[in-house]
């Protein structure tokens, strides 16, 4: 016997092999298993005895016949007991014949049978035939035999010859309802509570609720009845009332169970189903009062509100319960939405509850944390139906609109603080906004006149007038609501910016997102109102906190950028606004055509109803505004009346079928309609505000304004060329804030406008901020590469070149390497053809030549760059050095070719100037230690030495020859002879600069020829011709006249003495009686021409040449005779001679410095020229004999030099100032001796002189800060005297002297306080004290008070202390005047003294008036404050005055007199203004 079925067969193996290749879904119900994992286990059978689960007795296993129907111990075992089925009742009828025939049945069995219907005999079948779809199995194993199932029989639907009409069908539905009522019952007594299919009896056996099956059947019946309105009148109201009573009772009981957390039945599902039944009955539109009981509506709503309130708790518990609740809630609210949409009127209390419930659903925050896509969809569905319901309530109940808006606004805290898509409402492809903005836009669009207009047919004039009035009222309500929303949001945000800023940001972002979509036509009105509010924040009369202004500016920038998007996206003229339509009425039809296209688009929109109506009404708004522009014109009114009539007629006509346009295609058309909106018209005020904010002192505002401009420029690069924008950008590049400058530069980069702004960009090439300098450097490189203009290239290259003196090594290295790459390395770029190499080479030559025109400073920098970097072999690799060498050789060849081409051709002035510049470049190349000029080059240039053209061309050729002959050798003798002949023959016709090159060149030629005979003859001839003049100077100095020959002889003699090391022998100089050195002899000759009686022109030339010889032989500065000449000139000499001496000394010091730099830096790797000088100062000063002489000369004449710096003639003073800057840079003097003069020079009326002195003072501050503060008092006094002396009538026009010093010295808070103390001490101790002579200093006091009014203060305490001091001084002067009035009236006191005191007193009073006015103070306020208020005042900041704000009014001081000092009329006029008590 087999122990199991299939034993000894292959059936088990076949089954396992077959199943190994088949899905097991039909065997293992995975869906049900997954549900079981999370579903709590419930025991459906409650056992009172555990016998059924006792262990099997051992003897049972030993029973010889295991399969037996007679179990062991049958008599002793207890029977199994089963739990009563749900809904089963025990109130069976004993008289039932069917049950009576079944004796021995238990009570439960009888009850079950009594509630069971008899089965129809036709339903009894022998076997069950399944209609389930069979899977077609594939044969995997060859030896498995499978029987294919029979094909499924195709069942054809029979066509009934009888068709029921809808009324008959409705009657069938009513009968179905009546059959259901047999079980529900007309009342409690007739209800079939025992039928568990329709009723559920709770544990107390006295409470009954509808079953799920019953509710489902009610849903089906009522849905069918609702589809056939014709049978609604046949419904029995009492039947409906019974159903509603049962449903309300069911909902109430279920809600109680849910609150008690009882889960024996699905109470939630039953309550939702019952609520839907109630709402279905409401939809039947039965006006019977019996169905209008409050409980019928309030109980379901109470349940829905409870469910909505508990969604978050349910979500926190986890599981899929919340998803199920949301699905049921959505279905129920969907039915309720149908009800309120059709209901003409709702109770106010009901509306309030509905608004509360829907608002909580829409603005719930727990949904922000949902990650499940399915759950997000359910939440979105519920929020959508909630927003639709709110919109319906808003439309149907105008009196509740503000309440609805306020309720939504009360939930602003619930807005998402990020733009996460799962937290927002999807309104289109990749477009999302917050649910708050969605519902606000939706309800605001309800405010329209479409329905009003649709009721008009061919309106007359009166009706049109009423229409316009109605439209105005609607617009007024809409604008009021929009303002209320905006004010609430702004108030919320500004109350705590850090906490609620996201509310404002989200709202603005939402509005700018939808403003270009025709589905949301109200958004432009909201943005216009919002922008107007934000612009008002920057009203100067009501200044707000900087954080508020910053937030507002960010919003303004986003809105302004959106306006520009609209202007650029429009397919119409950007200026086609209302003014344009007023001037060109024929364009109105084109605008309305665009509107019709947008309306056609809206008809295809999902939410087309309200947007369509509002968009249509915007046409009406356009016509209304056009009418307001000229109310009185009858012709204009007549034209518009026709437009009004046409518009009203169009509402009754079908729209033209437009192409199926998408959001992208409709954008240009809709933007063209927006051009007439108020929002677009605010673009100009917006732009003006942004530009004005660039001039504010608050850096945060300026930075924000720049970001706004950046948004605009990124969209429209032509924005930078708008005159107002361009002018503002240019002005702001001089801004004091590095961040602002850098941001402005980024704006220019954004607009790709480098070349157009290249000059303004380079205003900041030497800015204090490394960030700005690096930015300018980077932009200059781009400009250089992008432009083809040689002048622009040279300009930016010069600025790059200046950065080799930067204090940052990174900038230095960048500047040097970039110039090397562009000027040198680019010549022979890899794989470049010879033609391209020549082209690159010539570009570099032209740029460098143009650059060298920039002055001595730029020439020195280029020479430094060339010698100390380009030709510094230690700074480059071996390959780079080879490339540099070959490139410079090619460069030199091309320079020579270009020089020859220019000279050979008939060129214009511009090309001629370019040729001179190129020749200057060649002279710089020739000065390099590694000369790239060959003998062939020298020979090629020789013919041009004979040119008689008076220009610098010959000078540069002489420089090239001089430098080259010092390095090259082995020239042909004939060439050397001819060249020497040419040079010597042209010496008498050369100017001073040419002589300085030609004479050393002649001496070099004589050494190459090893024959100095000819140059000695030339020198002897010169000295011989000079002898008669020396004789006259000895015997009769006054007889020496300044003729041209004598001047030229002096220069020639000096040149020979400086550059030629002659051997004074009788053979070479037979006419000289002395055999001393030629330079000594010439020095004595020059001393003869420096006598006092010699004409000052000759004296000036002789003194200049004397200093030049001494510069060549510095030991002459130790000569008593030379020093006597210099002492005399500085003590009592003429100014022009003093300036000549300074210029000569300047050249001497410069030459000494250059010599030191070359000694140290040729093979060095020092970063900058400044650093190189420091190395020179540290290592070679002690070794240089001449350095001591330089310092001694400066110390000897420093006082005279400083006085010359402060003379009234600014042009002459500039010579001394340049010399002062040089000696400070080279360290030839004690800086403390110069600081007061440097401070005084910052009061100069000349802007260049002010800038130069400010630069000098800044350098002194960096190295000697304490010393600078110690000298500040003296510097202010010296500067005051200088300012009054240099402009005695207009000294008061400069009120920024102290302000400039404050900006330079206030590098930190301590220094700012220190500066104020020094200034206060200077003013009150040195000028406003009892020991001052006011006749001499009253103008100084006016000047100081003018400047004192413009300095800034850190806090109110500093300002108050200053004003208190001024008030006390004012009282003192008032007493002084009173003391002297009697004496003046009796002629005992002079008018000079009295008038000076009056001027001082009035200037102090005017200062008080100005300060009180600018800082909104008064003397009364000052008197109320005491020492206890100091701490509060110290914590209050003081707004700095604008540079453009005026200062003291001189009319109030001078009383109309040009010179009040020593003027009796002035004194009497002042006395006449005094009160009797003051006299």
Swiss-Prot record:
GO terms for cellular component: 2-micrometer circle DNA; chromatin; cytosol; Scc2-Scc4 cohesin loading complex. SUPFAM superfamilies: ARM repeat. InterPro entries: ARM-type_fold (IPR016024), Cohesin_HEAT (IPR026003), Nipped-B_C (IPR024986), Scc2/Nipped-B (IPR033031). Pfam families: Cohesin_HEAT, Nipped-B_C. It is found in: Nucleus. Its main location: nucleus. HEAT repeats lie at residues 681-718, 720-757, 792-829, 1117-1154, 1229-1266. One of its GO terms (biological process) is tRNA gene clustering. Keywords: Cell cycle, Nucleus, Repeat. GO terms for molecular function: chromatin binding; cohesin loader activity; kinetochore binding; sequence-specific DNA binding. Plays a structural role in chromatin. Probably involved in sister chromatid cohesion, possibly by interacting with the cohesin complex. Belongs to the SCC2/Nipped-B family. This is Sister chromatid cohesion protein 2.
